[in-house]
Amino acid sequence: MFKNIGLAVALVAAIPSSAQLAPGVHMPPEIGLAYGRLGTAMMAHDAEGVRTVWADDFVVNSPNNTVLSREDVIAVMERDFLDYRNFRKHITFVGEKPEMTVVMGYDTMIPVKGPGAGKQVMRPFTDIWARRSAGWQLVARQATIAETR
């Protein structure tokens, strides 16, 4: 169980009020709005809200090299393990293609519960967004905990 909790902790994509773009980086408005909806849904533990942003086939490669599905992560969220203080998203790269956008950067946060609770965590990430019939959806994420202080 703690393995999945640690994996899910590495997944949270954004809390919009604390996102920072590196100089010269442009975020497509639709994806910026989707990050905002995702952050709001994650903070509220709103599974249906998360499902509107994460594609049905969403997968994440977590820090311990385990691949989790959308529903795996939502199950951990619903058990109340995805709470953070001082969450910041630093976006360093956005690569746009007609049907796909890659967003890279790193998150910093202090987990309230679970692995790393009470310590500052730095987590590089890569998010893959795809244009689907429902709009832009997050289809894949890689997140690695690089540093804990």
Task: Give the location of each predicted region.
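A beta-strand edge to alpha-helix "cap/lid" segment located at domain peripheries
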Residues: Q20-T52, V59-R149
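N-terminal signal peptide c-region/cleavage motif recognized by signal peptidases
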Residues: A14-P16
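Bacterial N-terminal signal peptides that target proteins for export
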Residues: M1-L7
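Intrinsically disordered and other compositionally biased segments
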Residues: L7-A8, A19
